[in-house]
Amino acid sequence: LSTDIVAPPV
């Protein structure tokens, strides 16, 4: 999905 978290919310 385009809403997949590919990077941790820093």
Swiss-Prot record:
Keywords: Calcium, Hemorrhagic toxin, Hemostasis impairing toxin, Hydrolase, Metal-binding, Metalloprotease, Platelet aggregation inhibiting toxin, Protease, Secreted, Toxin. One of its GO terms (cellular component) is extracellular region. Optimum pH is 7.5 with azocasein as substrate. Incubation at a pH of below 6.0 or above 9.5 results in an abrupt decrease in activity. The keyword Hydrolase applies. It comes from the Eukaryota. GO terms for molecular function: metal ion binding; metallopeptidase activity; toxin activity. Optimum temperature is 37 degrees Celsius with azocasein as substrate. Incubation at 55 degrees Celsius for 90 minutes reduces activity to 20% of its maximum. It is found in: Secreted. It is an enzyme of class 3 (hydrolase). One of its GO terms (biological process) is proteolysis. Snake venom zinc metalloprotease that hydrolyzes the alpha chain of fibrinogen (FGA) but not the beta or gamma chains. Has caseinolytic activity. Induces hemorrhage after intradermal injection into mice. Intramuscular injection into the gastrocnemius muscle of mice causes hemorrhage, edema, myonecrosis, increase in serum creatine kinase levels and multifocal lung hemorrhage. Inhibits collagen-induced platelet aggregation, but not thrombin- or ristocetin-induced platelet aggregation. This is Snake venom metalloproteinase patagonfibrase.
